[in-house]
Amino acid sequence: MATTWPPRTVIRKSSGLRTLESALYRSGLGPVAGVDEVGRGACAGPLVVAACVLGPGKLESLAALDDSKKLTESVRERLFPVIRRYALAYHVVFIPPAEVDRRGVHVANIEGMRRAVAGLSLRPGYVLSDGFRVPGLAVPSLPVIGGDAVAACIAAASVLAKVSRDRLMVAMDAEHPGYGFADHKGYSTPAHSAALARLGPCPQHRHSFINVRRVANGSGGRVVADCKPDLPLQRDEGR
């Protein structure tokens, strides 16, 4: 009888972040890359996607790895340089708001995952994606629900994407004062909604989101003139 690989029981009953990756490495399917995104639900700023390949060994310096959303900012900042130092390869992709609007957030997310994996300096033997199937990859892949809490490579990618995006949003706050990007990181908070209503959208806002579109339509399409659509930090990075 045909079986699927990796066995679903490995995913459901994983006893640690390295269980699934270790099984893939033992089966000769490494290197294993994890891929994750941050900013999918934000109404401003880029969608940021990262891919990361960790070695098969366990590193004590990465013991704190988990879903980036569960970690404090200080822990994420501490892990960020450690991941970049010890990763066999990583690549971070920035999908600008205009492309998110043009493609739609889900399609942009999948495209970002493809770009992140393609940008790795080390070709993976297998790719684990957080939650979404990623068609069009050149290597076998598996979507893992809650993958950033199951696979260390996905958790590492999550941290890389989260810290990269948060730092960009802080820089964007200085470029576009008044919106509070450094605080809410582009997500729809009451403070952000109030600033959006007061100032109108800037080019970093996603018009495919109904709250932005409503404000833009209500203000006659007004866009803040001194908002700069491109920031130097919005470049893919990796090794």
Swiss-Prot record:
It is found in: Cytoplasm. Its cofactor is Mn(2+); Mg(2+). It comes from the Bacteria. GO terms for molecular function: manganese ion binding; RNA binding; RNA-DNA hybrid ribonuclease activity. Keywords: Cytoplasm, Endonuclease, Hydrolase, Manganese, Metal-binding, Nuclease. It catalyses: Endonucleolytic cleavage to 5'-phosphomonoester. Manganese or magnesium. Binds 1 divalent metal ion per monomer in the absence of substrate. May bind a second metal ion after substrate binding. InterPro entries: RNase_HII, RNase_HII/HIII, RNase_HII/HIII_dom, RNaseH-like_sf, RNaseH_sf. Its main location: cytoplasm. A divalent metal cation binds at residues 36-37, 130. Residues 30-221 form the RNase H type-2 domain. One of its GO terms (cellular component) is cytoplasm. GO terms for biological process: DNA replication, removal of RNA primer; mismatch repair. Its EC number is 3.1.26.4. PANTHER family: RIBONUCLEASE H2 SUBUNIT A, RIBONUCLEASE HII. Belongs to the RNase HII family. This is Ribonuclease HII. It comes from Mycolicibacterium paratuberculosis (strain ATCC BAA-968 / K-10). The lineage of its organism: Bacteria, Bacillati, Actinomycetota, Actinomycetes, Mycobacteriales. The gene is rnhB.
